[in-house]
Amino acid sequence: MLAGMAKPAVLCAVMGFVCALPAASPCAAQDKAAATARQMAGGVNILGYDGIWDGGVDAPFKQRYFKMIRDAGFHHVRINLSAFKYMDSRNDLDLRILARLDWVLEQAVANDLIPVIDEHDYDQCQRNPDECGMKLLAFWKQLAGHYAGRCPTAVFELLNEPGGKMTAAWWNTLVQSVLQVIRANNPARTVIVAAINSEDPLEIRKLELPPQDRNIIVAVHYYKPMMFTHQGAPWSWRFALLRGIDWGSEDDKSRVTNDLEAVDAWSKEQGRPIYLGEFGAYEAAAMDARVRYTSFLARTARRLGWPWAYWQFDHDFALFHTDTDQWVIPLVDGLMPHDTHAETSERANYSSRRTTP
């Protein structure tokens, strides 16, 4: 799994000359953001809790899973990297992490998956925004330099779920600074910026992006109602003891529709594509209810023209069991468009390997 990680991401570099082109016009950049969003289509979050970042200890994610993800019908992977713990006192990132990230991107690209690099240190950032700001700027300066002229299909996501002690104004200021760092040597890179994480869909209206930078996709996450999606979650004192909460009534669906359409209205006003970067329901909920929920979210995102990424491939909320090498079939089938199940060789490959959970 770790063999060859230190070498450059060759497949990413083949078309690296694209990144060296002059900055595109605002209209062309907006077109690129929209095109990238369409190409991302459906995806899945990966590697958030995997030991790959620590050199392979307790690392259940295997190289062959990239092909299995593509064969199942997914078009991108959102790579969850909590990088701050791998930075030294000067905020220099451990070069071994860059080598491991190179390997992940190379495998994604080799399997026709768009890689989204998600800086995932939301806990630390929500608790200590000032320290977060320094680390985030340092991280993206190093990442932008490392991938300048390389891997043009890779997308940079600035930060997972900004919020907590961050104010919208503080986040807007940091976004401007990080974008300046990235644009210095990645003028054509598509970037994802999250709105402040909130259960209120109108919170997105507080996000302020540089009007001249149109190659940006805006991320939102959706887990409402939390009493359903997080019932039984042992890390939550609010929801750990909850059980038996259902989802799927017409009222349930209307609330989701109203929330997402409010976000979509902002998207159309601002001319910014939307990315549903996380959604899902924890395993304690009944499987049929989980399928109804995830299927409805994915279908609604497709109807609105949004790319989406299910949370997550393995560990909790799992779409795949690495201990048995089995997909959670009802969830995968619920996420995918029903009219495309048997229409591609990729789906045929997935179907030949499917097993019941």
Show which residues each predicted segment covers.
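N-terminal secretory signal peptides that target proteins for export/translocation
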Residues: 1-7
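Bacterial N-terminal signal peptides
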Residues: 9-22
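The substrate-binding groove and active-site-proximal loops of carbohydrate-active enzymes
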Residues: 50-53, 86-98, 123-133, 159-169, ...
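Aromatic-rich peripheral "rim/lid" segments of glycoside hydrolase catalytic domains that contact
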Residues: 286-357
